[in-house]
């Protein structure tokens, strides 16, 4: 899954890394939507995802990721439970101009124990922060990766996905070992 706040670059990231033509459900922002959606900081945004984005990328032979980009607005969160079924992990795309928009996605993945990385989309003109400062501001669990990226750049997006796969692999292994350790008792 690729999640994050409104205008953080989720559609852009899925489109940049997908090796197939991405499925997009973009619609023009309406006047009615402007009353509901906070467009502060993303004034140039003219479209929004109304269902999901879908793409696919092969990380290496035998490992393809199906990418589901979530809508950024609260009113579409009911879709997240369906999109997260069977998820290996997630990317929370962050815009430092609206960092507070990440909290719902961070909370969602933490609550469901879905491994995730935070990818800070480095918009031009936005202040750049150190990864540890972003982790502290988002109150992330120790070890949750934070990476800087450019969602428009395929190589940068692929690096984010590789970090997510590596982290998810470590988390799944740790949980497996934990469950095996808990199941073993004295003989």
Can you describe what each PLM-predicted range is?
Residues 1-46, 55-66:
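Conserved G1/Walker A P-loop phosphate-binding module
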Residues 105-108, 133-134:
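A general structural detector for well-ordered alpha-helical segments in enzyme core domains, enriched
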Residues 112-115, 143:
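A short helix->loop->beta-strand "cap" motif at the edges of active sites that frequently abuts
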Residues 124-179, 187:
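Canonical P-loop GTPase G-domain recognition
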């Amino acid at each position: 899954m690729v999640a994050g706040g409104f205008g953080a670059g989720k559609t852009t990231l899925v489109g940049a890394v997908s090796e197939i033509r991405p499925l997009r459900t973009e619609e023009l922002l309406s006047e009615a939507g402007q009353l509901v959606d906070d467009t502060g900081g993303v004034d140039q945004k003219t479209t929004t995802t109304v269902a999901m984005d879908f793409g696919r990328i092969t990380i290496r032979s035998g490992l393809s990721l199906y990418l589901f980009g979530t809508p950024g607005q609260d009113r579409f969160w009911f879709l997240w439970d369906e999109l997260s079924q069977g998820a290996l992990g997630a990317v929370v795309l962050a815009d430092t101009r609206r960092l507070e928009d990440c909290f719902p996605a961070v909370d969602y993945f933490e609550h469901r124990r879905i491994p995730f990385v935070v990818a800070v989309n480095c918009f031009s003109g936005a202040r750049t922060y150190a990864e540890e400062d972003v982790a502290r501001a988002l109150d992330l669990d120790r070890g949750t990766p934070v990476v800087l990226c450019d969602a428009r750049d395929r190589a940068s997006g692929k690096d984010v996905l590789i970090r997510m796969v590596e982290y998810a692999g470590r988390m799944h292994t740790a949980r497996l070992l934990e469950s095996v350790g808990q199941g073993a008792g004295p003989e």
